[in-house]
Amino acid sequence: MNSAKLIDHTLLKPESTRTQIDQIIDEAKAYNFKSVCVNPTHVKYAAERLADSGVLVCTVIGFPLGASTTATKAFETEDAIQNGADEIDMVINIGALKDGRFDDVQQDIEAVVKAAKGHTVKVIIETVLLDHDEIVKASELTKAAGADFVKTSTGFAGGGATAEDVKLMKDTVGADVEVKASGGVRNLEDFNKMVEAGATRIGASAGVQIMQGLEADSDY
């Protein structure tokens, strides 16, 4: 297993500077990570710097609340892809899920999948805000909507991935949909737990530390 190719090297803090973006790009090239995951404002720059490197550009949509309208999420997706994004990590309408408005949740995801035009879509369900049954339902809706991954967390809601949630999500979606674990994956031990639970992608700012087997000091 090439551990580096499971990692989306992530920097989503609102105060991220161009210098910090340069650093994660350089690290992603050095370690040959799967992608860098950055906010939409940095996508075009990252895509230019990563051209022909083999490292993909991932960005976030409706982030971190998931509470923007479906049309807004679809436009954000189209704009991101136009700017060079390869992969889209969207946040579901969490309130709609909790209301039981499952059609709204699924249609929201479907609109992003359609706007992504074949690009990989990962669906953040924010597990820390959900109970067991809601995690199952959100995972089912992600699969039904045609997305490629179901993802645990934004890292902005006070909690991140757990191996238990990753396993539950993987058991729910089966072989057709992959699972991304993100939020609080800070070292090689955390990384291995998530992979053993069924994750095939890891979102972390600690990619370098994971590869070096070191503890990181960041929550995302």
Swiss-Prot record:
**Which GO MF terms are attached to this record?**
deoxyribose-phosphate aldolase activity
Q: Which reaction does it catalyse?
A: 2-deoxy-D-ribose 5-phosphate = D-glyceraldehyde 3-phosphate + acetaldehyde
Q: Which Pfam families match?
A: DeoC
Instruction: Tell me which family the UniProt entry assigns to this protein.
Output: Belongs to the DeoC/FbaB aldolase family. DeoC type 1 subfamily.
**GO process terms (BP):** 2-deoxyribose 1-phosphate catabolic process; carbohydrate catabolic process; deoxyribonucleotide catabolic process
Cellular component annotations (GO), alphabetically ordered:
cytoplasm
Q: What is its main location?
A: cytoplasm
Q: Which domain of life is it from?
A: Bacteria
- Reported EC number(s) for this entry are 4.1.2.4
Q: SMART domains of this UniProt entry?
A: DeoC
Q: What is the purpose of this protein?
A: Catalyzes a reversible aldol reaction between acetaldehyde and D-glyceraldehyde 3-phosphate to generate 2-deoxy-D-ribose 5-phosphate.
Q: What is the protein's name according to its record? A: Deoxyribose-phosphate aldolase 2
